[in-house]
Every structure is written in C-alpha cells, then in structure tokens.
A protein has these predicted regions:
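Bacterial N-terminal signal peptides that target proteins for export
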Residues: 2-15
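C-terminal segment of classical bacterial N-terminal signal peptides
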Residues: 19-28
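Accessory carbohydrate-binding/adhesion or oligomerization-edge regions at the termini
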Residues: 28-125, 205-236
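Extracellular beta-rich ligand/substrate-recognition surface
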Residues: 130-141, 179-185
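Extracellular and analogous surface-interaction loops
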Residues: 143-156, 193-198
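Non-cytosolic beta-sheet module surface loops
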Residues: 149, 158-162, 207-209
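Aromatic-lined ligand-binding clefts that engage carbohydrates, nucleic acids, or primary amines
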Residues: 154-169, 203
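Beta-strand-rich ligand-recognition modules
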Residues: 167-219
Length: 236
C-alpha cells in the first residue's frame, strides 16, 4: 500500500468526497460524474477576473473539446487549406456566441467547453485533450477568452505562437494567421496594429493539428514591443 492511500483510509466520508471531486476520482454520489484532473497543465478557474502573467501572456481560456479533423501529416497546412478548415461551420454560434463553462455544443458529436487557467505561458492543448480522454491527433481546437481593457489602446499588436497552424480573431475580425507545419514559438507572428477597445474584447482562436504535440501562446504588445499586462481576462 502506498503512502498516498494510507492517509486516506482514516479520512471522513465528506473529505473523501471532496478529494474525489478534486482529483477526478469517482465521487460516490449516484449519477454524478467527476471531472478528470487536468493538472499539472491546467487549473479550474476561480471566481473573478485574472491578469496576464508578467510577460503579458493570456492564461485564462475557454477550451472546446477537440473536433475530429483527420490529417496524417501537417505538411498540407497551406494558408488555403487552413483557412477553409478553420472557417468551416462546425457548431452553432461558432463565431458569434460567448460560450459558458460546461456548455455542450452540437458538432458532429457533442463537445463541452471548459474554463481553465493554464499553469504555463503556453496553453498545452495536447495535455488538455489527453486528460479528458479525447483525440489528440488529427483535430481542431477552439479557444475563447475576454480581454477587459481599462482604456482604449491603439497601435497594439497581438502576438501568437502555435503548434501547428492557427487563425485568431479579435472582436470578430481575423487578426493573425499561422500557416504550414510549425512548432510553437512565442511571438512567432505579430498582427498588424490593432486597437483594444475600452472594456470587453473577445478573442477567438482555432488551432489545427495532425500528428504531434499541440499548444499555443497569445499576448499583446504595445507600439514599443513591451508586453501589455494592465488588462484583465475572464471567460464570462
């Protein structure tokens, strides 16, 4: 018997119930399905908005369980193919609705949105899918977050790195595209100069991947290339 389980034997039933919920163990409540643990790459969001990390990377996201899109390699991820694949309709409200944590959308199969805080500057999509027992290869991931700016910010740039190809929209407008087979590199592609509105700004992203790992990172930089950290992010 390992030490991990020795100390559980004498725990009260209520404590065991709570522990099961946190770790993805069966809760013991009839009809209740515990959410698998997404540690160490993610944590469940806590109430209230959060801020980017000290380097400006946005870590709070709503992630949709992966959409099946078979690709045996990433070599065919041309701009034309990626744009067709990522702008095709997969679920209602794809480009317009603000999803909610736990919301299920009807794609080819039901898929659930998860509100998460990444523990790394790069959001590890492969780990997300694997932890949920979902496909990790030949898939499309959708990500949404809300950036709340204390004032209008002009001449900023969105910077993105992704593995593999991806497209990103700011307030409904395509802002960054990363095409071809690529590794995730921070600040891999910078947008043209854009404006963050005072108040809420909606970011949507779609990442396509064949075989291999998949992740992304997003931040905003000012006209001098300095990371913007005075905004807040949330998923509601």
């Amino acid at each position: 018997m390992t030490g991990q389980f020795k100390w559980r034997l004498g725990m009260p039933a209520a404590a065991l119930l709570a522990l099961g919920t946190l770790t993805g163990m069966p809760s013991g409540v009839k009809g209740q399905v515990a959410t698998p643990s997404l540690a160490p790459s993610f944590q469940r969001v806590t109430p209230g908005a959060t801020t980017p990390d000290r380097d400006g990377f946005l870590r709070r996201w709503l992630l949709l369980e992966p959409i099946d899109k078979p690709n045996r390699s990433n070599s065919g991820f041309t701009a034309t193919y990626v744009r067709q694949a990522l702008t095709a309709p997969y679920f209602p409200g794809q480009f317009t609705a603000l999803p909610r944590d736990g919301q299920v959308v009807r794609a080819a199969q039901p898929l659930r949105w998860h509100a998460l805080d990444s523990t790394n500057f790069d959001v590890k999509l492969f780990d997300f899918a694997k932890a949920l027992g979902k496909p990790t290869y030949g898939v499309i991931f959708w990500a949404v977050t809300i950036v709340d700016s204390p004032r209008e910010m002009r001449d900023v740039r969105m910077t993105v790195g992704s593995n593999s190809a991806s497209i990103w929209w700011l307030n409904g407008k395509e802002t960054v595209g990363l095409f071809n087979d690529r590794r995730m590199v921070m600040d891999d592609v910078l947008s043209d100069r854009v404006t963050l509105r005072k108040g809420r700004n909606v970011i949507r992203g779609a990442v396509i991947n064949g075989p291999g790992l998949s992740d992304f990172c997003v931040r905003f930089v000012d006209a001098n290339g300095r990371p913007i950290t005075e905004v807040k992010t949330d998923v509601r």
